[in-house]
UniProtKB/Swiss-Prot annotation:
The keyword Lipid metabolism applies. It catalyses: a lipid X + a UDP-2-N,3-O-bis[(3R)-3-hydroxyacyl]-alpha-D-glucosamine = a lipid A disaccharide + UDP + H(+). The gene is lpxB. Keywords: Glycosyltransferase, Lipid A biosynthesis, Lipid biosynthesis, Lipid metabolism, Transferase. This is Lipid-A-disaccharide synthase. Pathway: Bacterial outer membrane biogenesis; LPS lipid A biosynthesis. NCBIfam families: lpxB (TIGR00215). It comes from Photobacterium profundum (strain SS9).
Length: 380
């Protein structure tokens, strides 16, 4: 009897859980008995992945913030190395979370396990010498964006451009009225989606300034509604606390649903930088990006980052399509002025550019990623 295909896999946050679930489905379409084990979120577990640790263990952002969790992160890594070296998979796939996964991949590769890193770290943006660590740690990198593959090719590091799963999943035209009906939102008024982050550290930094921003906008737009996507109960509790402390008189619709439906239902979006900014571009909604980290983290990042922009819409376009208000600029007065501007604009040209970029990364990523991994281990 043939031994089933066995894949080690680690995802570190919600976006990685979504990617991992799609990848698992694509592999199982060809190898129904394939086994997956590692660090997973609920979507990956629903596809049959055995979770040795909960994904929340790894979901921490910012250099200073990581230091506080370092002992636990090191313990999780050591236990994963022990498990995978004692029970070697056919291949290990680390999804994003590069500071954790690349170290894990290096250890596993040194033990003779083939390793794939899914989602290129932003080596083109900062700490470019990491490409040599990536080369040492991986047999293959799977990249979302065409310019990422071009960067790896310059250094002869194996990389496949697979496109982006979100670009595949989201139609080029989205239905605002249907999303509003799904979320029971009043279709006769305008809505601002408020997305202060999926991580606890992000919510802690952004909830209050985003709520203050809504307070200012309400003065100018009395009929504007605010709808907030909350990824889990912990984030809901954090937001509710900030709401009661900052502006209890304001009305927010809190939604335990994906950010995607909330953005589609809205006329404009105020969001934390990250994957959700790409998703907002793909659903075709004008946005303002706000982001803050602890001052020491910001000081370090400013000395390392090589790109002009933080949001992928701007990086893909290589121009400032989307307003980014970062750190000391991420204040209610500036945020509200920019949201007011997009609420008062036509935005047709902006949304046309979003659509062109959407099409450029819509490539059936799940299947391309699965094919690349299976090719690496000679299973195609």
């Amino acid at each position: 009897m043939t031994k089933p295909l066995r894949i080690g896999i680690v995802a570190g946050e919600i976006s990685g859980d979504i990617l991992g679930a799609g990848f698992i489905r694509a592999i199982k379409a060809q190898y129904p008995d394939a086994e997956f084990v590692g660090v997973a979120g609920p979507r990956m577990e629903a596809e049959g992945c055995k979770a040795l640790f909960d994904m929340e263990e790894l979901a921490v952002m910012g250099i200073v913030e990581v230091l506080g969790r370092l002992p636990r992160l090191l313990k999780v890594k050591a236990e994963l190395v022990k498990y995978f070296t004692e029970n070697p998979p056919d291949v290990f796939v680390g999804i994003d979370a590069p500071d954790f996964n690349l170290r894990l991949e290096l250890d596993l590769k040194q033990h003779g396990i083939k390793t794939v890193h899914y989602v290129s770290p932003s080596v083109w943006a900062w700490r470019q010498k990491r490409i040599f660590k990536i080369e040492a740690a991986t047999n293959l990198v799977l990249a979302f964006l065409p310019f990422e593959k071009a960067f790896y090719d310059k250094f002869n590091v194996p990389c496949e451009f697979v496109g982006h799963t979100m670009a595949d999943a989201i139609p080029l035209e989205t239905d605002k009225a249907a999303a509003q009906a799904l979320l029971n939102l009043d279709g006769s008024k305008r809505w601002l989606a408020v997305l202060p982050g999926s991580r606890g550290s992000e919510m802690g930094m952004l909830a209050a300034p985003f709520i203050e921003t809504c307070k200012l906008l309400k003065q100018k737009h009395p009929d504007l509604g605010f709808v907030v996507a909350l990824v889990n109960e912990k984030r809901r509790e954090q937001f509710q606390l900030a709401w009661q402390e900052t502006a209890p008189e304001l009305d927010f619709v809190l939604v335990n649903d994906t950010a995607r439906n909330v953005m589609i239902a809205s006329d404009a979006v105020l969001l934390a930088s990250g994957t959700v900014a790409l998703e907002c571009m793909l659903v075709g909604r004008p946005m303002v990006v706000g982001y803050k980290v602890k001052p020491l983290t910001a000081w370090i990042i400013r000395r390392l980052v090589k790109t002009k922009y933080v949001s992928l819409a701007n990086i893909l376009a290589d121009k400032p399509l989307v307003t980014e208000l970062l750190q000391e600029d991420c204040v209610p007065e500036k945020l509200s002025a920019e949201v007011d501007r997009i609420l008062s604009s036509d935005n047709t040209e902006l949304l046309s550019e979003f659509s062109i970029m959407h099409q450029s990364i819509k490539c059936d990523a799940d299947n391309r990623a699965a094919h690349a991994v299976l090719s690496l281990i000679n299973k195609v």
